[in-house]
Amino acid sequence: ILGPVLSLVGNALGGLLKNE
């Protein structure tokens, strides 16, 4: 269950960091 959640969170955080 945590797998997909962590993946989505990681993608969101990665996108924000890459945006800056």
UniProtKB/Swiss-Prot annotation:
Sorted keywords for this record are: Amphibian defense peptide, Antibiotic, Antimicrobial, Secreted
- Entry keyword Secreted: yes
Tissues and organs where the protein is expressed, per its UniProt entry:
Expressed by the skin glands.
Q: Which family does it belong to?
A: Belongs to the bombinin family.
Location in the cell: Secreted
The name of this protein is Maximin-Hu
InterPro entries in the cross-refs: Bombinin
The job of this chain, per UniProt, is described as: Has antimicrobial activity.
A cellular component term (GO) from this record? extracellular region
Give a yes or no for keyword Endoplasmic reticulum in this entry: no
For biological process, the GO terms are: defense response to bacterium
Domain of life, per UniProt, equals: Eukaryota
